[in-house]
Amino acid sequence: MAAGTSSYWEDLRKQARQLENELDLKLVSFSKLCTSYSHSSTRDGRRDRYSSDTTPLLNGSSQDRMFETMAIEIEQLLARLTGVNDKMAEYTNSAGVPSLNAALMHTLQRHRDILQDYTHEFHKTKANFMAIRERENLMGSVRKDIESYKSGSGVNNRRTELFLKEHDHLRNSDRLIEETISIAMATKENMTSQRGMLKSIHSKMNTLANRFPAVNSLIQRINLRKRRDSLILGGVIGICTILLLLYAFH
């Protein structure tokens, strides 16, 4: 029975690690999609005076479809990983070996922390993408209003020129901000990759510790004995010090 329950726990851990690896790859691709959307919208904004609006709209709609598809896939993976974590929690509550509960709870908490990090990263990237898309839609509407005004009036007066120059300044400011965001996202991708390597090393160390519980028990007994010996030695030193003081004052 113990072998069967242990096999069930290992199967759950295997499922959790597989889903975590899939989520890690999906989130990196999702972040790259957000970055490419920002860059393409900037390029489209710079050349929209010399080309029609057909190509940017097609590019935007294609990226929007990719965004929706990837968001659904990531949400499904998060839901599956949540279900696996819930099953692991049920197993730890029903496990009949008290000595293993601490190790199981530690492993479960680690998987929960990973799930929380992935969920937070997904919602943050999704919010950034939505903000960029909303801003680009707003700027596109402004450009259309300007072009409509120019074609309707046919007058290229000083006021319109100043307005267009101000609009160009805003576009340049947006481009600088987007480049800064791109650098930050690239840094985040590198940190995510390093976190994956550290997670793999930590997982292997926990696996070794769980496979050899006798080693953990022996280490704990050694630490307890060292602590006891330290207390005894401290007591002996204290008694000797008191006796020396009494002898010195007499």
Swiss-Prot record:
Predominant location category: Golgi
N-acetylalanine modification, residue list: 2
Coiled coil: 9-30, 68-95
Subcellular location: Golgi apparatus membrane
Stretches assigned to the Cytoplasmic side: 2-229
Role of this protein: Involved in transport from the ER to the Golgi apparatus as well as in intra-Golgi transport. It belongs to a super-family of proteins called t-SNAREs or soluble NSF (N-ethylmaleimide-sensitive factor) attachment protein receptor. May play a protective role against hydrogen peroxide induced cytotoxicity under glutathione depleted conditions in neuronal cells by regulating the intracellular ROS levels via inhibition of p38 MAPK (MAPK11, MAPK12, MAPK13 and MAPK14). Participates in docking and fusion stage of ER to cis-Golgi transport.
Similarity field: Belongs to the GOSR1 family.
Protein name: Golgi SNAP receptor complex member 1
Gene that encodes the chain: GOSR1
